[in-house]
Amino acid sequence: YVDKMLTGRKDAFLYPAEYDNVSGYSEPQESKHDFFVIGHTSTSVSLASGLAKGRDLIGGNENIIAVIGDGSLSGGEAFEGLDYMAELGTNMIIIVNDNQMSIAENHGGLYKNLKELRDSNGQCECNFFKAMGLDYIYVNDGNDVQALIEAFSKVKDIQHPIVVHINTLKGKGYAHAEQDKETYHWRTPFNPETGEAKVSYEE
């Protein structure tokens, strides 16, 4: 949604009369900045790998950046994208926002390894991303803007695929959101002091 706000569609989020003028997800008919019609999960890495291939074919030098959350990382499409990027071997920056949160809950061996990486500050011997042939760096405090700037400055214009694994706290700085990640993942209007919803579905 922030992407839509930054690409000329903010009115749909500000004015009720404009609400139906944008879709919930990426839609090329809405904006030149939307390249695909997609859903909301596990798609970014594979789509970015296609953009990277297209860039390489025309001799471009843009940074291709995919952002994916840990909850979406176990999707098959994400695995395919990571696998292909390792083979392509050219510039792509894969940002993994690891906030240990998924509405459906995270299960599987991948999440055990993500925990090992967090617990070891990214240094544990077993590293899923490196095993796939990808470069890797870890940011322990992903809510620290300066730490993010430093990490992104290091990987900008890199000539091979790299994973930037960022450990974040969902809702950082707002106690109600920190304590109730699922409710604040998608929220109706609420009182910022009490955290209580201003509307009820039972009304």
Regions found by a protein language model. Give the residues of each.
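Conserved thiamine diphosphate
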Residues: 25-28, 53-63, 108-151, 199
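Mobile "lid/hinge" segments at catalytic clefts and subdomain interfaces of large enzymes
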Residues: 74, 81, 86-120, 126-128
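Short acidic, glycine/serine/threonine-rich loops at helix termini
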Residues: 2-8, 73-82, 104-109, 115, ...
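Residue-level preference for the first positions of well-ordered beta-strands
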Residues: 63-65, 91-93, 161-163
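Structural beta-sheet core signal
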Residues: 50, 66-67, 94-96, 166
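Cofactor-binding active-site loop characterized by glycine-rich and histidine/acidic residues
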Residues: 1-88, 203
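Short, glycine-/Ser/Thr-/acidic-enriched flexible segments
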Residues: 1-2, 30-32, 71-73, 99-101, ...
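Terminal amphipathic helices with adjacent charged low-complexity linkers/tails
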Residues: 96, 103, 143-198
